Design a protein with these regions (language model features):
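All-alpha prenyltransferase/terpene-synthase fold signal
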Residues: 1-325
């Protein structure tokens, strides 16, 4: 059985209910709004975030209407943030499909993103849980702050792992942490259990982001972006940060500063990518992923008793670290 089938096995019916509720949340009778929401609904991914929420609820109790509305609220918040991110990044594509701003325009994208965000707040209010409502509100602030922090880190000449992890913890890791935490909260898990679930989600998110960053050092049609795309956008990720710090190569450090100032050529990016590969950057990033994987496994061994849920969460963890796209 493949990873995704294992992940879905304990929550198959719950996931179908989530998809139905999520799709209904993105329906509207207005002509233009209906068109844009249909466009967004068609680009559904693997449902990794809602599956984590459902699995955590199943682990600590049961999947309830509180769980489902919380899952829809969180996924809508994430969807709204992606619509807005595409405007900020002037991106023309999202998951192999034309972005909302490219298909329509920036005004429509911003307004529809706001509409989806409001719908997210509506759904999470149906949970009638002050803790979950507060958590989602805090997540929205954290994700926005993470984007601003990343913009600031690009213009800042300092290059360090600390800054790299600080950005991740307010972006990808924060999202996965919230999924695990909200799933546990929806099943009335104890404070200790919720904290442990959040840490598991954070580890998952860090692994997910490091894997994404490693992809950027290789060409892949499946991934849908060329080698060095992050550097083109002014971002220095873990593999190159390690290679620079471990060698102290001043010539390469000059190129790294050109990445941050957006003055680097494609030929120089190719040099920096090759330098990273030759100096253990990929191997180091891979090792760090497995360090976080080991910590995440401690959560499974301590807090997950149901064998099907254990297998599903382990498959989830293994999928994130071993995925090819």
């Amino acid at each position: 059985m493949d990873y995704l089938s294992l992940i879905k096995q304990p929550i198959e019916a719950d996931l179908a209910d989530f998809v139905d509720l999520f799709n209904k949340s993105l329906m509207h009778s207005d002509g233009l709004l209906s068109q844009v929401l249909d466009h967004i609904r068609q680009r559904a991914g693997k449902r990794m975030r809602p599956m984590l929420i459902l699995l955590m609820a199943r682990n600590f109790g049961k999947v309830s209407s509180v769980t489902q509305h919380s899952a829809v609220g969180l996924e809508l918040l994430h969807t709204a943030s992606l619509v807005h991110d595409d405007v900020v990044d002037e991106s023309g594509e999202r998951r192999g499909q034309a972005s909302v701003n490219a298909t329509y325009n920036n005004k429509v994208a911003v307004l529809v993103g706001d509409y989806i965000l409001s719908t997210a707040l509506l759904h999470v209010s149906y949970s009638h849980s002050e803790k979950i409502v507060r958590y989602l509100a805090e997540l929205g602030r954290t994700l926005s702050n993470g984007e601003i922090l990343q913009l600031n880190s690009i213009s800042n000449e300092e290059i360090s792992e600390e800054i790299y992890y600080e950005v991740i913890n307010q972006k990808t890791a924060a999202l996965f942490e919230a999924c695990a935490g909200i799933g546990a909260l929806s099943a009335n898990a104890s404070a200790v259990e919720v904290t442990a679930a959040k840490r598991f989600g954070q580890n998952l998110g860090i692994i997910f982001q490091i894997r994404d960053d490693i992809f950027d050092y290789y060409d892949s049609k499946e991934i849908g972006k060329p080698t060095g795309n992050d550097m083109t956008e002014g971002k220095l990720t873990l593999p190159v940060i390690y290679a620079l710090k471990s060698t102290g190569d001043e010539e390469m450090m000059k190129l790294a500063r050109k990445v941050k100032s957006r003055e680097i050529s494609s030929e120089e990016i190719a040099q920096l990518v090759a330098f990273t590969k030759e100096n253990g950057g990929i191997e180091y990033a891979d090792k760090r992923m497995w360090d976080f994987h080991a910590e995440a496994m401690n959560f499974l061994d301590t807090y997950v008793e149901d064998r099907d849920v254990y297998n599903a969460l382990k498959a989830y963890l293994d999928f994130v670290i071993e995925r090819k796209a």
